[in-house]
A protein has these predicted regions:
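Positively charged n-region of N-terminal signal peptides that target proteins for export
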Residues: 1-4, 189
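Bacterial N-terminal signal peptides
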Residues: 8-16
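N-terminal active-site segment of His-dependent metallophosphoesterases
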Residues: 20-78, 125
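Active-site-proximal segments of metal-dependent phosphoesterases and phosphodiesterases across multiple
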Residues: 23, 144-153, 169-214
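Alpha/beta-hydrolase fold active-site loops
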Residues: 26, 59, 127, 134-135, ...
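Active-site neighborhood of phospho(di)ester-bond hydrolases with catalytic His/Asp-centered motifs
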Residues: 30-32, 60-66, 90-96, 140, ...
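Short, glycine/acidic-enriched loop or turn micro-motifs at the edges of active sites
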Residues: 36, 69, 144, 182, ...
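Extended active-site neighborhood of metal-dependent phosphoesterases/phosphodiesterases
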Residues: 73-163, 168-169, 198-208, 222-257
Length: 262
């Protein structure tokens, strides 16, 4: 009987250890505020791409807005050509500098251009969802293309959609990717998001959001608010390597590592 119990407890311990061993980690890279300008020196962007390509175990790269210096297809075309040099899949968020209906580059036109010029680019709208290693990534669009400005604005339909997506994936860990921070990383009122409290009400209804990753302010900052990591990254040459450790557990650890390309 003692031998049986000994074997039983040994089996339980080994099973638990295997469970720990199988805990998954995943890594992605955030690049923000590239501000690509056709006809200008964009070597810094090229250096960042080269640096990111050297990093190991990166699942994907996300560009979190202000990808262009101004809303033009020339800038967008140059940005895409450089981004295509990445050796990992990449996703694109729209920022305030990227779109302007009066400049013939609305958000609809921007997405159409991406789909036309990037093979296998799947998103059909500025806001979209994708899944990597059982983690749900939600791209939330807060840009304005009718009256562009530096203040982010997450419209009611975007917040309703976000609420529905968080409900749909309530049993999964979620990371939100966007250009405009909800929690200001510095005191720049001209960059604040309009009515952030409405966005925070949506977050308060759910416990599956682990991080909100953004750019826009030109500031590197990390802070935790109500259990959610709010990570803001400045423009190039800075970028972040973000590790989600124990990604398949209810409480993963988010580790954001700041890097700078030379």
């Amino acid at each position: 009987m003692k031998k049986f119990l000994s074997l039983f407890f040994t089996s339980v311990i080994l099973s638990g250890m295997c469970g720990i061993c199988e805990a998954k980690d995943m890594r992605f890279v955030q690049i923000s505020d590239v501000r690509y300008s056709a006809g200008s020196d964009n070597q810094t962007f090229a250096n960042v791409i080269q640096d990111v390509n050297k990093q190991k175990n990166v699942e994907f790269v996300v560009f979190t807005g202000d990808n262009l210096n101004k809303p033009s297809t020339d800038d967008l075309d140059g940005f895409i050509k450089e981004a295509k040099k990445l050796n990992r899949p990449y996703y694109i968020v729209i920022g305030d500098k990227d779109v302007n209906k009066l400049k013939h580059l609305s958000k609809v036109e921007y997405v159409k251009y991406l789909k036309k010029h990037i093979r296998k680019y799947k998103p059909e709208t500025p806001s979209y969802t994708f899944i990597k290693d059982n983690i749900v990534f939600i791209v939330a669009d807060g840009a304005k293309d009718v009256i562009p400005g530096t203040n982010g604005y997450f419209k009611e339909d975007v917040l309703t959609w976000l609420d529905n997506e968080l409900t749909k994936y309530q049993d999964k860990n979620v990371i939100i990717l966007q250009h405009f921070p909800i929690i200001p990383p510095s005191e720049k009122e001209a960059y604040y998001t309009f009515k952030p409290e409405e966005y925070m009400k949506v977050l308060a209804k759910h416990n599956n959001v682990k991080a909100v990753i953004s750019g826009h302010f030109g500031v590197n900052n990390e802070q935790s608010v109500r259990g959610v990591s709010h990570i803001s990254t400045a423009g190039i040459p800075d970028y972040r390597i973000i590790d989600v450790m124990d990604a398949d557990t209810p409480n993963p650890t988010i580790w954001a590592q700041l890097k700078q390309a030379e």
